Amino acid sequence: MNQFLFVSFCALLGLSQVSAATLSSGRIVGGFQIDIAEVPHQVSLQRSGRHFCGGSIISPRWVLTAAHCTTNTDPAAYTIRAGSTDRTNGGIIVKVKSVIPHPQYNGDTYNYDFSLLELDESIGFSRSIEAIALPEASETVADGAMCTVSGWGDTKNVFEMNTLLRAVNVPSYNQAECAAALVNVVPVTEQMICAGYAAGGKDSCQGDSGGPLVSGDKLVGVVSWGKGCALPNLPGVYARVSTVRQWIREVSEV
């Protein structure tokens, strides 16, 4: 990626971001094609029928994505596609009833890059549609723990969307080292978690923003931002879900 925002799912993909000043949005780089049944919590967030961000099902009525994906808070602007490996067809399309960005979200620094989407109707769960568990506030991700990120974003750092879902496995990155690597971009805060390889080569990229970063069986991050895609010594940055667990519970009762 050049520079991007993303939400991630620690084990499958990498990082993704949305264009803004020096940041860009992303797609999976160095990953592999994956079936939706392997990541049934993954959804495509769409505008006018076109994919632009990812998201994660956390209950039959709620999806968690990145706040930078929902700067327009009019729910009529969005739908989600769930249950399909193909972002252009299959699965189900569900309207969004309300868009609730985190009240402390900062669009300049991407701090608290979370947004809850209340769906217009409850969705039924199946092999290809399922909620993912959330970490509690006290839970942490150890340095080097493998995570999976998934999405339909750019695979070649050229902002060209994938039609079929992809994922990448990346290790969590030491927080202090991540902050030092990105010190000239934006501050890496406690509300963020980093993942990637020092050598680069695997990451999320344009179009993956808002998607899941999964460690074990829990959603530990949301693809938020990064400096380029899959570049050496520049890990991807995700919004750390455990830090807003109470807010998610208060808003969604999940």
From Swiss-Prot:
CDD domains: Tryp_SPc. This is Trypsin 3A1. Pfam families: Trypsin (PF00089). The active site is at H68, D113, S209. InterPro entries: Peptidase_S1, Peptidase_S1_PA, Peptidase_S1_PA_chymotrypsin, Peptidase_S1A, Trypsin_dom, TRYPSIN_HIS, TRYPSIN_SER. Disulfide bonds join C53-C69, C178-C194, C205-C229. One of its GO terms (cellular component) is extracellular region. GO terms for biological process: digestion; proteolysis. It is an enzyme of class 3 (hydrolase). Its EC number is 3.4.21.4. It comes from Aedes aegypti. Residues 28-253 form the Peptidase S1 domain. GO terms for molecular function: serine-type endopeptidase activity. Residues 21-27 form a propeptide. It is found in: Secreted, Extracellular space.
